[in-house]
Each structure stands twice: as C-alpha cells, then as structure tokens.
C-alpha cells in the first residue's frame, strides 16, 4: 500500500489531492484511519503541517508521497521533488538534528520526468537538496509546486503534480542508469537535475554545499545518505568546484571508508 499525504493547511496540497480524487478515484481517509486493503494507494488528510508527521511509519506503507506547496525566497515558480532529513545540528522545520529519512530515488527520478513531459507552462523543474522533516523509516518523497502565490494556488499546475504522482503509482517501473548520492552544489542542484533527466541518474540524498559544516565536519552523514534509501546506492556524484580542497579530502576519505566510488561533475 502506498500513502499519499496532504494537509488542509496547504492550498497546493489540497488542489493536488482533490485532482487525484476527482479524476482518478483515489480514496481519502482521515489521519489515523485505515486504508481499504484492496487499493494500491490511498490519500490521507491531515490538519497538521506535513513536516511534523514523524508517526507515519505506523501505517506500514511501502512508500509515501507528500503533496506540498513549494516555497522560494526569490518567488520563482517551479515543480520540485526531494527527500527529507537534516544534515546539521539544526532541525527548525521538523525531523531531528543529524538524521535523514529513507529516500525514494527511482520515484523522484520518475517525478522529474513526468514534470518535464507535462511542463507546458515554462516553470523550473528541479530536485531540491535533502531538507526538513518529517523523519521516517518508510521511503518517502515530497512532490511540490509553487514558488509564489499564483503558482501555489494554480489548479493547472496542481494537475501536473497530481498526474505525475498517479503515473508513478500505477504505471511501469522507472528506468534508470544508476542510483547515486549528490554532494555539493546548491539547494537547487542544477547539475544533479540535469544528470537525472539526461542520463538517468537517480539521486537518493543530496548534501548541498551550504549544509556542510565547517570544512566537512559533518561528512559522517554520508553513511546515512548511502544506507537510508529504498534502492542501493552505487556511486557518489561530487560537484567538484563547489567544495574547497579540505572539504573534498574529507568527503573522499569518508566515501573510501564506505567503499563507494565517485564521479566529478
């Protein structure tokens, strides 16, 4: 069973859920209720922030999609997807310090592809680096649209995101070349998104430059990035020039310890 979570506090989330219910007959239940066992997926409504739902492992879902608005300081409209977790000692937006959730790399790759196919609106399409809560052992991903008020409330954009989730749940398996983790780059890791869309790299977790403490003091988190994922990680991808030499050395040392090779981009 697959869970699809939406929050009544989030208009984009509501619009996506309503689309799935109206167009594809998804069953909706309230948080704490049971899904019909005959269905492949169901929608769960919550009155809480999606970032606070650390208790969802109790449902024993095989996978969880979070339908969410996207926030952008620059107001850039975008379709995005990302895993959850906190790389640092801070956990201001849910989850716990120095804890990553289990990621869903193939589903995130599939969502990016669905966005690209349906994006007739000129919105940005991107991964976001791993950030915020909730903290879960169940593999999960956020599927988002927004960046500004118009994009958040746009029902045509919600249709794109809703249809992407539907297609990933009910259509064929995602083809990919390799499952990887990403190190460096920015919160919107353009190079990683391009590798996903052009070469089929399925990113599990992404550690952006700004979340690296000091000159690599928290590279121990790479072990979680490799182990906490639905699919086995084969290699790391490092945005070489975004890291200084001391940080690169610590990253490579940790990757060697984990027995993981790397590519420079």
Name each model feature, range by range.
Residues 1-131, 135-137, 148-149, 155-159, ...:
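N-terminal catalytic or cofactor-binding beta/alpha core of small enzyme domains
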């Amino acid at each position: 069973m697959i869970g699809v979570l939406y929050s009544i506090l989030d208009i984009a989330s509501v619009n996506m859920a309503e689309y799935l219910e109206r167009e594809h007959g998804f069953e909706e239940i309230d948080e704490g209720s049971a899904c019909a066992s005959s269905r492949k997926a169901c929608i769960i409504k919550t009155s809480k922030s999606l970032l606070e739902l650390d208790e969802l492992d109790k449902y024993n879902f095989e996978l969880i999609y979070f339908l969410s608005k996207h926030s952008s300081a620059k107001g850039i409209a975008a379709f995005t997807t990302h895993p959850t977790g906190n790389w640092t000692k801070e956990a201001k937006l849910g989850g716990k310090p120095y804890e990553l959730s289990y990621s869903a790399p193939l589903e995130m790759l599939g969502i990016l592809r669905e966005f690209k196919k349906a994006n007739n609106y000129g919105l940005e399409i991107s991964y976001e680096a791993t950030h915020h809560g909730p903290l879960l052992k169940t593999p999960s991903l956020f599927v988002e649209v927004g960046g500004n008020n118009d994009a958040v409330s746009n029902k045509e954009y919600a249709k794109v995101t809703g249809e992407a989730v539907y297609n990933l749940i009910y259509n064929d398996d995602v083809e990919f070349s390799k499952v990887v983790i990403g190190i460096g780059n920015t919160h919107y890791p353009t190079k990683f998104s391009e590798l996903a869309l052009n070469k089929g790299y399925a990113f599990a977790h992404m550690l952006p430059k700004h979340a690296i403490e000091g000159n690599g003091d928290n590279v121990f988190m790479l072990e979680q990035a490799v182990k906490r994922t639905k699919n086995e990680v084969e290699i790391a991808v490092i945005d070489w020039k975004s890291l200084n030499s001391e940080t690169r050395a610590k990253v490579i040392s940790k990757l060697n310890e984990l027995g993981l090779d790397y590519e420079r981009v």
